[in-house]
A protein has these predicted regions:
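S-adenosylmethionine
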Residues: 135-221, 226
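Accessory RNA-recognition modules of RNA-modification enzymes
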Residues: 1-157, 164-168, 176
Length: 227
């Protein structure tokens, strides 16, 4: 149908996202590093949990951001014992940890991240939460493989700056979660992604914006979408 047609702008945005994913993968590819002082590792705490991550890896730029965002995501997710959640573009599993605390041992949290070092750091930090499954895989591929399986109650997405895009959002919507939490740092890409959710039958239930990147045009936005 007409709603499924791809425009030239859609193709350009898809290619931009793929290029961004490729750059992200290249940034995390194995390469020679020299540590002149210290361990080459950084220690971060969120909600009382300790993460030890590579100093060259990804963490939120603002020192208070990981705690603030995860608090809001936990509030919006509102999962009960036995709940199911997906954490897409999960990094080292900061959001996955908060979701897992809500679902408890009878629940399942599936966390997907393409950067293997981040997945390894997350596995170490979340080793006491065996109901969290961390997958080192491209989100674009993983979601297409899991549509039609057990439906998640909540999906959290924190994609790269270019956004999640039509393919991923279409697959997430097809999975049928009751609530979706979408995170974005580029307002234009964020708005495009929200319009895709709305076209798929989701409504914007809440929206928060954080000035986490002072002196830049970037604003961290979190949206709660529901059916």
């Amino acid at each position: 149908g007409a709603g499924d047609e791809w425009t030239a702008a859609d193709v350009t945005r898809r290619d931009d996202r793929r290029a961004a994913s490729a750059r992200r993968a290249a940034a995390h590819a194995a390469r020679d590093e020299w540590v002149f002082e210290g361990s080459g590792r950084a220690v971060e705490y969120v909600a009382g949990r300790r993460w030890e991550v590579a100093a060259t890896g990804f963490w939120q730029a603002h020192r208070g951001a990981a705690q603030r965002y995860s608090d809001l995501i936990a509030e919006w997710a509102d999962l009960g014992p036995g709940g199911r959640a997906w954490d897409l573009y999960s990094g080292a599993g900061v959001f996955a940890a908060r979701l897992a605390e809500q679902t408890g041992r009878t629940g399942v949290v599936l966390a997907v991240e393409s950067a293997r070092p981040a997945v390894a750091d997350g596995a170490a930090a979340l080793r006491d939460l065996p109901w969290v499954e961390l997958r080192a895989q491209r989100v674009e591929r993983w979601v297409l493989e899991h549509v039609g399986g057990a439906a998640p109650d909540v999906v959290v997405l924190d994609p790269p700056r270019a956004g999640a895009g039509k393919e991923v959002i279409g697959a997430v919507a097809a999975a049928g979660p009751a609530r979706i939490v979408h995170v974005g740092c580029d307002p234009a890409a964020f708005a495009r992604d929200l319009s895709l959710y709305q076209a798929a039958g989701y409504r914007l239930a809440d929206l928060r914006a954080f000035d986490a990147f002072p002196a830049t045009h970037h604003v961290e936005c979190l949206a709660l979408l529901a059916r």
